[in-house]
Amino acid sequence: MRLAAIILVGGASARMGADKALLCWNGRRAVDRLADLARTVGAEHILTVGHGDHGLPRLDDPSPDGGPVAGIAAGVAALKAKGYGRVLVLAVDAPTVRPEDLSPLIATVPPGAAYEGLNLPLVMDIDASPSDAGPGWAVRRLVERAGLARLACPAGATERLRGANTPEERHRLLTALLQAETAA
């Protein structure tokens, strides 16, 4: 089954005070780090959903105030039309996620999975996406209605997977990223 990735780049970034997609993380924009990550784990196509042109294939969020599921639903419809069968959904506020953090999700059997206590990232078979999913839905509801498994989060990965919504959270993640990439 062909895998594509959606990177959610919407949201007002009010708590962060800057567009999270454009923030630099050790010299690279968040959106670029995530696009490379998605390719590394096998995504054949990357689609950003939200606002702004980030130099990648994009889809404007048809309901910018409708929450992440509105963007996921729009992206899933676009990817289904292109013949993709499975989607990895990433949030732009989590650019320090590592390939090994995603491996358990990628390896799941249909219809896909998300981690316990986190709604993103997730992997979902496109045909499992509820046809009525859209604005106002919580991601948790999408996960439940799609029948996605809940997996234990890999040890030490929770903070990376949760991402950064404030400058303080970004500072903690950036410090850890710099230490990890310097040691590598």
Task: Enumerate the language-model features and the residues they cover.
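Nucleotide and nucleotide-moiety/phosphate-recognizing core
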Residues: 1-118, 126-131, 135-137, 144-157
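Conserved alpha/beta core of the MobA/IspD/sugar-nucleotide pyrophosphorylase nucleotidyltransferase superfamily
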Residues: 136-184
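Short glycine- and hydrophobic/aromatic-rich loop-to-beta-strand nucleating segment
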Residues: 119-125, 162-164
